[in-house]
Swiss-Prot record:
Taxonomic source organism: Bifidobacterium animalis subsp. lactis (strain AD011)
Residues annotated for Mg(2+) binding in this entry: 104, 247, 249, 251
Protein name, as recorded: Phosphoglucosamine mutase
Source species taxonomy: Bacteria, Bacillati, Actinomycetota, Actinomycetes, Bifidobacteriales
PANTHER family: PHOSPHOGLUCOMUTASE (ALPHA-D-GLUCOSE-1,6-BISPHOSPHATE-DEPENDENT) (PTHR42946:SF1), PHOSPHOHEXOSE MUTASE (PTHR42946)
One term of GO molecular function: phosphoglucosamine mutase activity
GO CC terms: cytosol
Keyword Magnesium: yes
Reported cofactor(s): Mg(2+)
Assigned keywords, A-Z: Isomerase, Magnesium, Metal-binding, Phosphoprotein
Function: Catalyzes the conversion of glucosamine-6-phosphate to glucosamine-1-phosphate.
Recorded superkingdom: Bacteria
Gene of this entry: glmM
Amino acid sequence: MPRMFGTDGVRGLANRDLTAQLALDLGDAAVRVLGDDGGRETNRHRALIGRDTRVSGDFLSHALAAGMSAGGFDVIDAGIIPTPGVAFLTSVLNVEMGAVISASHNPMPDNGIKFFARGGFKLPDTKEDEIEAVLGQDWERPTGAGVGRVSHDTTTATNLYIDHLVSAIAPEGNEQPLKGLKVVADCANGATSVVAPEALRRAGADVIVINASPDGYNINKNAGSTHPESMQAMVRASGADLGVAFDGDADRCLAADAEGNMVNGDQIMGILARAKKREGKLNHDTLVVTVMSNLGLKLALKEMGIDTVQTNVGDRYVLEEMLRGDYSLGGEQSGHVINREFATTGDGTLTALTLCNEVVKSGKSLKELAADFPQLPQQLINVPNVDKMAAKTNKAVLEAVAREEELLGDTGRVLLRPSGTEPLVRVMAEAATQEQADEVTARLAQIVADELAL
């Protein structure tokens, strides 16, 4: 039986896969697993809930809070707030757990629930397995004064988070480091529709806001980091210095330069890593990336005296490696960037602020900064209906990969990744030219299809 928890919590079609009953049961199970006595100033257990702008978030947040409060937790409902805002508040308010109701960049009908432990860190697999193990089980729940209360305080929670974000680039509290910078902010009609524009304005930027009118149904719809075209067009039309685009729960950010050219997560990480090294804040002069990061980033950073450490795909694995090796910066090509100086998870709004700050500090345009991190030409082919697990053991496939890697040398690479949810293998190649990347990928994809066919 597959795990209920995926790589980023529990997700599914709201009211079909993810029902009110399941949300209640998850809240009930989570209090049993995550409740502790450490760090509490009173004898009450506390949890915090936040959500994105999906209409289904209403009933799911009520159900989740019901499960938690029935289990004896006082619940603070922070309302609509970015996922990293919940992580921050879980830490700063010293509550025992935080929970986010969001399906991130997925379409509106989907939703999800994920948890943060005390301190604002995502749960390890072992804790998720414990929650799943007790899900729906009966237990001796509290009665009388032992049951929890639910309070609603969106304004205080949001302002605490915005203050924290701005302080990352304006530590004195009254500076306006982004004064004179014109920025387009595409909020994906999602959780940062209030937070990102306000944080950028407080930092002094001239902000043009688009896709920040959530109605419960338009989250991620032709907007945000998965559909940045409207942001790119607005940058060109308005003469802005740059644009930033977030996803539905604002844990990721992509950017565009003044000409509307996209700047991806790899380039953003490169820019921020170099800035941190200059300031003496890049621990061990190392950036943590995933296997999907472009080889061009690694080669450019090497020239700058910056090493890279590679993990599997997923910001949770990036964070695990950052904690293990005491690294200060890491992330993914998709725009998840974790800046451990200020956050315990990927934070799109923080990424936007620090990127804008580096544009101002450097005196260079975003186009100039991004040009220092050229991306090698890349090709990706999904090969369906194959035995995906055999991709790592099949002799013919492994020999073919070795041949291609030898041909590419130091200016290219090959990656075979089994899908986590489908019977397919992703075949990716990077090379000095697009033609070479296309040819390598085509040859390998054919061998994978022939050798691993179901």
